[in-house]
């Protein structure tokens, strides 16, 4: 009887039996990482990264500029980036759009691309 009481007490006091939980890790934001992402597919290996101090999830959308000056979507790069800011870079042959987010897990998946 005493053994059952002790076992019950151990199971009540140790709800995460065999696992160590860090309360900070439970609130980490996760992001996708892919060097070349296009139309819902990662050409390579899709991995995850967790945000560290001053980091955000980032999507870099690469566009090719046509002779008429229009942008044609080419591919995206997904990553965790330090000191990330939303910005557009415009060159003679390409445009790069950088979009940053840190509001939810895996928020850096491009929509409508």
From Swiss-Prot:
The UPAR/Ly6 domain, residue ranges = 29-110
CC annotations in GO: extracellular space
Question: Where found in the cell?
Answer: Secreted
This protein's UniProt keywords = Disulfide bond, Secreted, Signal
Question: In which tissues has expression of this protein been reported?
Answer: Isoform 1 and isoform 2 are expressed in prostate and testis. Isoform 2 is expressed in male and female brain at equivalent levels, in particular in cerebellum, cerebral cortex, corpus callosum, occipital, parrietal and temporal lobes, and pons, but not in amygdala, cerebral peduncle, hippocampus and thalamus.
The positions making up the signal sequence are 1-26
The disulfide bonds in this chain are 31-57, 34-42, 49-80, 84-101
Where primarily located? Answer: secreted
PANTHER family per UniProt? PROSTATE AND TESTIS EXPRESSED PROTEIN 2 (PTHR47884:SF1)
Can you tell me which family this protein belongs to? Belongs to the PATE family.
What's this protein's name? Prostate and testis expressed protein 2
């Amino acid at each position: 009887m005493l053994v059952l009481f002790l076992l019950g007490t151990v199971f009540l006091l140790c709800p995460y039996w065999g696992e160590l939980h860090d309360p900070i890790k439970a609130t980490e934001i996760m992001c996708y990482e892919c060097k070349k992402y296009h139309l819902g597919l990662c050409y390579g290996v899709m991995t995850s990264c967790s945000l560290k101090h001053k980091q955000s999830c980032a999507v870099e959308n690469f566009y090719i500029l046509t002779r008429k000056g229009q942008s044609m979507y080419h591919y995206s790069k997904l990553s965790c980036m330090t000191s990330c800011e939303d910005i557009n870079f415009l060159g003679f042959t390409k445009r790069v759009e950088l979009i940053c987010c840190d509001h939810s897990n895996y928020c850096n998946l491009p929509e409508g691309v």
